[in-house]
């Protein structure tokens, strides 16, 4: 099973449909949620791939022996007429709130929940055992209230945006090892490649989920 938390394209144009054509040539299920750079055209192109599992709503879907749930990002930022760049945090959090409600109502709880923006994961903390996100172009992993949140870096190296900074954006992916019966995270490998023009490659293995992070305490006064 391959999991992709979105932003498969830069501008979400129909010309970029071919970016997802390679998905159909893989011989494993490909679970995907829409990112804020992915348009409805891109989502439709992904749905046309025979092995794609497009998650965009409250339904629990089974793939590769795992129960999955996910929701696409509420924004489409390349179209500046939408003013989605200025969308308030509540719009992003609402994605997770809808998933949290569906999670609570599901008879068979999903073992893996996908969102694009880590902010959308907040309402899922304390519910789902494992939540995967993207968007930040930076790898972050933490456990809070029993939920492990894994934010993936840029598996595609951020496209042409990788050239905007002095150093190229590294290519990052994570291989998860899940219990065959429970779907619980047992270990994971973090792979990092140097990015455009950089031949550096690193891999590190982590055993078990990361240590729990205490929930912030309310301030007094």
Where in the sequence are the language-model features?
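His/acidic metal-ligating clusters that form di-metal
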Residues: 64-148
């Amino acid at each position: 099973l391959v999991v992709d938390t979105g932003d498969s394209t830069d501008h979400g144009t129909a010309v970029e449909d071919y970016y997802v054509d390679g998905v159909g040539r893989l011989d494993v299920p490909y679970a995907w949620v829409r990112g804020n750079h992915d348009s409805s055209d891109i989502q439709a192109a992904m749905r046309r791939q025979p092995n794609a599992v497009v998650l965009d709503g409250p339904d629990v879907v089974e793939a590769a022996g795992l129960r999955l749930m996910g929701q696409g990002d509420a924004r489409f930022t390349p179209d500046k007429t939408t003013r989605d760049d200025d969308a308030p945090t509540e719009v992003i959090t609402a994605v997770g709130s809808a998933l949290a409600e569906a999670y609570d109502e599901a008879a068979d709880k999903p073992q893996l929940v996908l969102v694009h923006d880590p902010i959308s994961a907040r309402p899922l903390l304390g519910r789902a055992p494992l939540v995967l996100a993207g968007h930040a172009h930076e790898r972050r992993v933490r456990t809070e209230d029993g939920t492990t949140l894994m934010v993936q870096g840029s598996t595609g190296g951020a496209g042409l945006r990788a050239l905007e900074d002095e150093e190229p954006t590294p290519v990052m992916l994570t291989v998860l090892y899940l219990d065959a019966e429970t779907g619980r995270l047992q270990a994971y490998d973090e792979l990092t490649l140097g990015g455009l023009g950089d031949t550096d490659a690193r891999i590190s293995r982590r055993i078990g989920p990361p240590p729990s992070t205490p929930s912030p305490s309310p301030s007094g006064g």
